[in-house]
Amino acid sequence: MHGRLKVKTSEEQAEAKRLEREQKLKLYQAATQTVFQKRQAGELDESVLELTSQILGANPDFATLWNCRREVLQQLEVQKSPEELATLVKAELGFLESCLRVNPKSYGTWHHRCWLLSRLPEPNWARELELCARFLEVDERNFHCWDYRRFVAAQAAVPPAEELAFTDSLITRNFSNYSSWHYRSCLLPQLHPQPDSGPQGRLPEDVLLKELELVQNAFFTDPNDQSAWFYHRWLLGRADPQDALRCLHVSRDEACLTVSFSRPLLVGSGMETLLLMVDESPLAVEWRTPEGRNRPSHIWLCDLPATSLNDQLPQHTFRVIWTAGDAQKECVLLKGRQEGWCRDSATDEQLFRCELSVEKSTVLQSELESCKELQELEPENKWCLLTIILLMRALDPLQYEKETLQYFQTLKAVDPMRAAYLDDLRSKFLLENSVLKMEYAEVRVLHLGHKDLTVLCHLEQLLLVTHLDLSHNRLRALPPALAALRCLEVLQANDNAIESLDGVTNLPRLQELILCNNRLQQPAVLQPLTSCPRLTLLNLQGNPLCQAEGSSEHLAELLPSVSSILT
């Protein structure tokens, strides 16, 4: 054995590594303690820079030590000559780059570099752009570096066209680049500002067509990559609806005025103010939500004094002015009438299709044909299927209703993990279609039975509905937003899976509630119905609570004003 090199056993190697780690830890802790002691004593000199360099060079994410470094550099700024300071800054930039090589996603390092360059009289921004390009070449999804690049581009006033060309180069190299696609969505509206395009920034048609060609190349190259599909969704546009008062309703019986808005707002929050004019005279009122909660809502209402509802006059005019939205609506309550209202005769574009809004329907039609072509090649691509559905919704939701439902079935089979989400999205679209049909027919009755609904949306659109049929669906609860249905008189929800009635509250006109064959377990779940003053008929047949002993007596005690309770 003599003359041969001894080979360490695995146990010896592990022990040696343990001792090495312990030694490094002792040095690390000693250096850290020394830095803190010097900082506490106010000894902010170059020795602190040296000590923190040793620690941060190994662990760039020690935020407190970056703070110490900044304190030292601020101290040295007033002590050093310009030449010495330039040498110090050059060394600091080099040290920061070495830290980024250790951890390219170090928050503290990137922040410190921003801080340092912001204090320089003439920073070399071209060098910083080159540094970003180098690090993005290593990892094009490093969002820390992308944030820093946007900072540098803003400070250096880099033209958006140059930055767009930079994203071109990265996307050409690798289509799967979320950050590059996102940066394009920020740059294009700057390059091509459109009047009245809103905060989302709509693009001119020629630019849009060019971008659509680019993104089509991406998802035809790799149909399963999500980044291009998300950018495609942005290109189609998501315009915000215009601020508007959708509906104004006055009830003489309830001595109440109700307003429906195009978006949720918080009245009395300083920004959102409602002014009520009755017969051209301002009336001070207290605004509240139907649920009585102080939070943003589509629906706001107020109580009216008896003088504003005097039936001796031929009519009363009510006008609500929304100051933040610069919108108003007026309705008339005629003598002898119990209610009056005014609502928008909204088209589908105004109500729902603003979510996908491209000026030219030919562009949408072309996109739909391209996606269908891709779907033939990739029949199980979920992104393609979802995009086809959204394009059909954008083009004509009623014309494509049947075809859309077929695509939903295919999509659920392809992507069963998101079946619940797809069921809810399908329910949302079906409810939108039903609301559109009701609007066109100008009726106050809405039939949503046998549609396999799993969720209720857009209830703020149903302020004037008097009869609502939700029978034979898959609803598990009636949502609090149901309180928006201030005119509702009859609610049918047979044959669902309803377990809770928390949403059936404060419905001033509700007279009949049909809940046969649901999953109501205990009489206590009916407590919310005590807030519905006109409820006279309640049908609970086929619910588990009907099997409990003494349930009829308990229900009669809980709801004494309900004259007919069927169990």
From Swiss-Prot:
Enzyme class, UniProt record, top EC level: transferase
Modification Phosphoserine, positions: S98
Tree of life domain: Eukaryota
Residue spans of the PFTA repeats: 44-78, 88-122, 124-158, 159-193, 207-241, 363-397
Catalytic activity: geranylgeranyl diphosphate + L-cysteinyl-[protein] = S-geranylgeranyl-L-cysteinyl-[protein] + diphosphate
GO molecular function: Rab geranylgeranyltransferase activity; small GTPase binding; zinc ion binding
InterPro entries: LRR_dom_sf, Prenyl_trans_a, RabGGT_asu_insert-dom_sf, RabGGT_asu_insert-domain
Positions annotated as LRR repeat: 442-463, 464-486, 487-508, 509-530, 534-555
Cystine residue pairs: none
UniProt-listed Pfam families: LRR_9 (PF14580), PPTA (PF01239), RabGGT_insert (PF07711)
Activity regulation (UniProt): The enzymatic reaction requires the aid of a Rab escort protein (also called component A), such as CHM.
Any one GO BP annotation for this protein: protein geranylgeranylation
Keyword Kinase annotated: no
EC number: 2.5.1.60
Keywords: Leucine-rich repeat, Phosphoprotein, Prenyltransferase, Repeat, Transferase
Gene Ontology terms: cellular component: cytoplasm; Rab-protein geranylgeranyltransferase complex
Residue runs in coiled coils: none
Keyword set includes Transmembrane: no
Family, per entry: Belongs to the protein prenyltransferase subunit alpha family.
Purpose: Catalyzes the transfer of a geranylgeranyl moiety from geranylgeranyl diphosphate to both cysteines of Rab proteins with the C-terminal sequence -XXCC, -XCXC and -CCXX, such as RAB1A, RAB3A, RAB5A and RAB7A.
The protein's assembly and partners: Heterotrimer composed of RABGGTA, RABGGTB and CHM; within this trimer, RABGGTA and RABGGTB form the catalytic component B, while CHM (component A) mediates peptide substrate binding. The Rab GGTase dimer (RGGT) interacts with CHM (component A) prior to Rab protein binding; the association is stabilized by geranylgeranyl pyrophosphate (GGpp). The CHM:RGGT:Rab complex is destabilized by GGpp. Interacts with non-phosphorylated form of RAB8A; phosphorylation of RAB8A at 'Thr-72' disrupts this interaction.
UniProt-recorded name of the protein: Geranylgeranyl transferase type-2 subunit alpha
